[in-house]
Design a protein with these regions (language model features):
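ABC-type ATPase nucleotide-binding domains, specifically the catalytic core motifs of the NBD
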Residues: 7-26, 34-39, 43, 130
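C-terminal boundary and immediately downstream tail of ABC-type ATPase nucleotide-binding domains
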Residues: 33, 120-129, 135-148
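Conserved ABC ATPase signature
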Residues: 45-49, 53
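ABC ATPase C-loop
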Residues: 62-63
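Conserved catalytic motifs of ABC-family nucleotide-binding domains
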Residues: 66
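Helical segment within the ABC ATPase nucleotide-binding domain
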Residues: 84-97
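H-loop/switch region of ABC-family ATPase nucleotide-binding domains
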Residues: 105-106
Length: 148
């Protein structure tokens, strides 16, 4: 799950991520710039947010620790397409800020919008890897390795 702390507001949940004390570009104002809806809901309990907003909060909280790498495990699962589109844009902005993203995802349209390289696994073994190719041929080759 997203591990949103029920008794804490959106802002308090974000501040939990800063507990590492690591300095970097990700601060509460930077997260609010990335996710304006979180600023609007700053004093709302984190668990009162929609699923998409909770996912934004979870990503924002992870960024607050100013990591070199963020692991995103199926971050768009169960989310509306409009939220998936927003997250794709946000993931690209995060990467542009110098934070590496490791994306575990079956949504190929998201993969080709966000990833530069892919690695496909089956039963714990790597079965394919390479540069992400958004052409129809590249999508077909990538889709051959994804079972939903």
């Amino acid at each position: 799950g997203r591990r949103i702390v029920a008794n804490l507001t959106v802002e308090e949940n974000l501040l939990l991520g800063a507990a590492t004390g690591r300095k970097g570009p990700w601060t509460v104002p930077a997260i609010y710039q990335l996710f304006p809806i979180l600023q609007e809901r700053a004093h709302t309990p984190g668990t009162a947010l929609s699923g998409g907003q909770q996912q934004m909060l979870a990503v924002g909280r992870a960024l607050m620790s100013n990591p070199g790498l963020v692991l995103l495990d199926e971050p768009t699962e169960g989310l509306a397409p409009v939220i998936v589109d927003q997250l794709a844009d946000i993931f690209n902005r995060v990467a542009d800020q110098g934070t590496a993203l490791l994306l575990i995802e079956q949504n190929l349209s998201l993969v080709v919008r966000v990833a530069h390289r892919y690695l496909a696994m089956s039963k714990g073994a790597v079965v394919a890897e390479g540069a992400v190719d958004a052409t129809p041929e590249g999508m077909q080759a990538l889709a051959a390795h994804v079972a939903v």
